[in-house]
């Protein structure tokens, strides 16, 4: 009987984890029962629209908002779900309860400490803290019903390229077993971190180095969270999407102006959205697209959602 790589990883890692470890995850809410009610995203959509939790105001009418209230605000603005980019602030059980109470889907989790506690760091303790932070994100996303964690693996100036990449590779390899057990792909985002591109070189660079790094794991649990706006400065989005292919699991969405060398609202600037749509169609992309721009209350969120619908032709 033949097994897929996904089946092999799931079975192998479940067997490798100890009973106390699994019991601990059940107690903290990160290993939720399949019989529990889980909010599900809308069906029948090719691209699901999301915003970062960090875009949603923390206060309204002088009152601090709970996670449940902030998720509801995203739902009121018409988003299909939310990317929980403040995962460090919540336990898995808290995230799951907020999703259940709000009725709004959470598809992903992020811990922004990945900039200060990096997998590429020369400091071993920082690398260990990075792994712990990512594990927490996996548990939060899984408990909330999500299917992925976005990570920034580090900075290129942490050392020579071959050294920093190997540090990150070893850290991610340690994370794959938990990713497989919880069904949480590790999604590497392209950022201005001087890795897998030449930060000081002109545009029209390729995505080959990024693709090679992801392929080095030979694992279905490592993929890409493609930030469309981030690398418009350095390469053509349609060409990058063609290079990514099936590796591209989720999208971050913002605008960028090459002419003014600055980020913009979605649809502003000179990013070729027609090419983006063509590239996504060519690779058969379906999944989550998450806004990462300035946020606010419901009206601002509705505007952002409308901008996303326009650039994706929805």
Descriptions of predicted regions:
Residues 90, 99-124:
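Mid-chain, structured segments of secreted extracytoplasmic proteins
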Residues 1-78, 145-147, 198, 207-314:
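Histidine-acidic metal/acid-base catalytic patches
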Residues 55-57, 88, 112-115, 153-157, ...:
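Active-site-proximal loop/turn and secondary-structure-junction residues that shape catalytic pockets
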Residues 83-100, 159:
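Glycine-rich, proline-tolerant flexible connector loops at the mouths of alpha/beta enzymes
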Residues 70, 95, 137, 175, ...:
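Aromatic/hydrophobic pocket-lining residues that form π-stacking "cages" and hydrophobic walls in ligand
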Residues 11-21, 41, 105, 120-226, ...:
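Active-site acidic/histidine proton-transfer and metal-coordination neighborhood
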């Amino acid at each position: 009987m033949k097994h897929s790589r996904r089946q092999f990883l799931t079975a192998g890692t479940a067997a490798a984890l100890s009973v106390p470890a699994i019991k601990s995850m059940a107690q903290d809410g990160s290993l939720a029962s399949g019989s529990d009610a889980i909010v599900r995203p809308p069906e029948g959509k090719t691209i699901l629209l999301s915003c970062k939790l960090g875009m949603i105001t923390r206060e309204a009418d002088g009152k601090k908002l709970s996670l449940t209230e902030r998720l509801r605000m995203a739902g009121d603005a018409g988003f299909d779900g939310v990317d929980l980019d403040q995962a460090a602030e919540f336990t898995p059980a808290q995230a799951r309860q907020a999703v259940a109470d709000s009725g709004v889907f959470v598809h992903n989790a992020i811990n922004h400490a990945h900039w200060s506690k990096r997998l590429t760091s020369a400091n071993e303790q920082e690398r260990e803290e990075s792994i712990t932070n990512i594990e927490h994100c996996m548990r939060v996303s899984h408990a909330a019903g999500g299917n992925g964690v976005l990570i920034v693996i580090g900075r290129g100036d942490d050392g020579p390229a071959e050294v920093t990449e190997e540090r990150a590779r070893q850290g991610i390899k340690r994370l794959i077993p938990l990713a497989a057990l919880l069904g949480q792909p590790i999604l590497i985002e392209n950022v201005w971190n001087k890795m897998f591109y030449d930060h000081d070189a002109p545009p029209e660079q390729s995505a080959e180095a990024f693709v090679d790094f992801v392929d080095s794991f030979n694992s279905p649990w490592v993929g890409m969270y493609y930030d469309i706006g981030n690398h418009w400065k350095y390469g053509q989005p349609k060409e990058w999407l063609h290079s990514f292919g099936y590796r591209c699991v989720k999208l971050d969405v913002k605008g960028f102006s090459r002419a003014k060398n600055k980020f913009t609202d979605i649809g502003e600037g000179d990013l070729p959205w027609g090419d983006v749509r063509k590239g996504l169609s060519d690779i058969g992309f379906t999944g989550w697209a998450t806004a990462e721009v300035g946020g606010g209350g419901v009206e601002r969120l509705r505007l952002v959602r409308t901008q996303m619908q326009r650039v994706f032709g929805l």
